Amino acid sequence: MLQETRTANTVAMPAAAPDYHHIRRAIAFLTERWQDQPSLELLAAHLGLGPTHTQKLFTRWCGLSPKEFVQAITIDHARGMLEGASSLLATAHEVGLSGSSRLHDLFVTHEAMTPGDYKRRGEGLEIAYGFHASPFGEALVMATVRGVAGLAFVDEDKGQTRAEALADMTRRWPAARYVETPAQTAVHAARIFEPAQWRVEQPVRLVLIGSDFEVRVWETLLKIPMGRAVSYGDIARHLGAQSASRAVGTAVGRNPISFVVPCHRVLRGDGNLGGYHWGLTRKRALIGWECGRVRQS
């Protein structure tokens, strides 16, 4: 059930948000032409910008030059991100989500709804939602009184509309009541997308709504630090279900809280990107942006 209650958004958009239109086009171009190693001048011409403007665009958006960004999304770099993944998950289990190695990452706390709540498919649940600018395109943020329940992106590469992005999320919990209150969700959006607001004393609160197995997979995703990656098989082994890589892949694909629950940090075992519900261009953007964050920290 949808109900509109529009109120003003008084929270400033993330500083990098206006740049994503150009960044998205640049990533698509670089992905198609990477074997040719296109020059800065060629990339700038494709974007309709000058070389200096293009260089500053990338530096402002992620702290990397275009050349460094391309290196961050290569398969060789991805394989490096996967090194030691099994021990990484084990170590993360010991130190939790606020260890010193995660000081450049978003801080979160989470709780999971009971299996009974999940089976009711959102019945009796009110979910506020709003659309907000982000460094990765327009984001749909959804929250209950207990915390953020959903975060999606409007997929420009597929020509997706806001209504289609909303429908993609509401079908997960069809019995819930949905109220458009962007002033409420803007606070969550700012804490998620503005690194200056990433503080251990003010973590983003999440509520995970899924099956027991899905929640276990999503909790494992929360253990992957920024700048690192694991494979679907690594997650299956960590959960003691070595033969369940396919089921893990399905659960990763059903993650309703993108970016915060970092399903983009899951790759195939050979370093290939695999899939991403909100498009591979955006997955590359997330990986490259996070590489820049790690280098700056």
Model-identified regions with their sequence ranges:
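Short glycine/serine-rich loop segments
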Residues: 243-285
